Amino acid sequence: MADDLVKFGDEATWDLICSGRSIGIFQAESPLVQSWLRRIKPRNIWEMSAVVAAVRPGVLASGYADQYVINKDDPDNIPSYGNDIIDDIFKSTNGTLLYQETLMALGSRLAWPHLEENKRLVQVDKLRKAVGKKNQQKIMEVGREFVEGCTKNGVDKELSDKLFELIKNCGRYAFNLSHAAKYARIGYETAYFKCHYPLEFFTVYL
């Protein structure tokens, strides 16, 4: 039903979201999320997804959320790693690591592209699981494998170490992009109803 009533790309709805006046909006009611809506100022579902991901503990603690805003406001600030594959992986997130899919792409395309598909997927999932837990031994083990894989495929060791530090810093709490996008869509839909059907919206909300 929502798809029949909601107009995506509605400027008034995005204005409401960007204002941070998000009481009643799905996954956006907390003061923390309100502040990030005002900072990121999303104007599409992908930028709204970034808000959902940005408020995760690991992303906040690592400073990646702040860096996302800085780079979004000034694209010239987005770093180049001197590697087309790395730059391409980070392109959709303004040069930052926001999602689990980003760390998985680093593993798949940089560390283990030479492996058969099944073995590559197993290794990438091992990376995802390792950084999602507190077991430092497993993190160090998969870190060595990641760095060895990267250097084997032409990435210098210093850059490989730096990439794994990025992964390790926020991987434990990095959000899944598909979940973030779904939350963002529902958030937009509830914002649309709040903006255009306020009586009905607040009747249900209250």
Language-model-detected regions and their locations in the chain:
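Noncatalytic, beta-rich nucleic-acid-contacting surfaces in large DNA/RNA-processing enzymes
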Residues: 1-206
